[in-house]
């Protein structure tokens, strides 16, 4: 976690795809920003892990990506593209938002970046988000965390802290 001249590195980690409580390695440090997956309807992806350690969700279904052809790849269509899913597909969205935040305000600490991502997440899916003890960045839900990440809102909030 150390780095950035004492501001700490932002670490995002996928919660896992077992449709159960978050476990190792996503639960090994409370400074990790844990990311679950959401589907195109704004609900928790059916296999995305959940629970007290969940911070946010990001799109985790039908994410286009590049791939290899042949026996080392999964691309059967021959066009170098395939769809990727699960919490490992959701996690890069959050890492990219953290990078965008730091591109407009590189003086933010890890804790501030995590807080911006969590506090600007959208409450989607019809879930009941409530004030929860220990969750200081707004209302929270055990299946969706603080909600679906919102890159635009996060960058705007980072700019306000300049």
Question: Whereabouts are the PLM-identified features?
Answer:
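Catalytic-core segments of hydrolase enzymes
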Residues: 1-67, 115-121
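Hydrolase catalytic cores
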Residues: 60-144, 148-149, 153-156, 160
């Amino acid at each position: 976690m150390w780095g950035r001249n004492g501001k700490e590195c932002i670490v995002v980690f996928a919660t896992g795809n077992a449709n159960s409580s978050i476990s190792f390695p996503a639960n090994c440090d409370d400074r990790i920003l844990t990311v679950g997956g959401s589907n195109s309807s704004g609900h928790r992806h059916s296999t995305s892990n959940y629970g007290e350690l969940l911070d946010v969700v990001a799109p985790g279904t039908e994410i286009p990506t590049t791939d290899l052809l042949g026996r080392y790849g999964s691309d059967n269509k021959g066009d170098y593209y395939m769809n990727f899913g699960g919490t490992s597909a959701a996690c890069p969205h959050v890492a990219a938002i953290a990078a965008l935040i730091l591109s407009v305000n590189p003086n933010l600490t890890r804790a501030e970046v995590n807080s911006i991502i969590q506090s600007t997440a959208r409450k989607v899916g019809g879930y009941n988000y409530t004030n929860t003890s220990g969750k200081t960045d707004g209302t929270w839900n055990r299946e969706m965390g603080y909600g679906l990440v919102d890159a635009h809102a996060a960058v705007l909030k980072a700019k306000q802290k300049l």
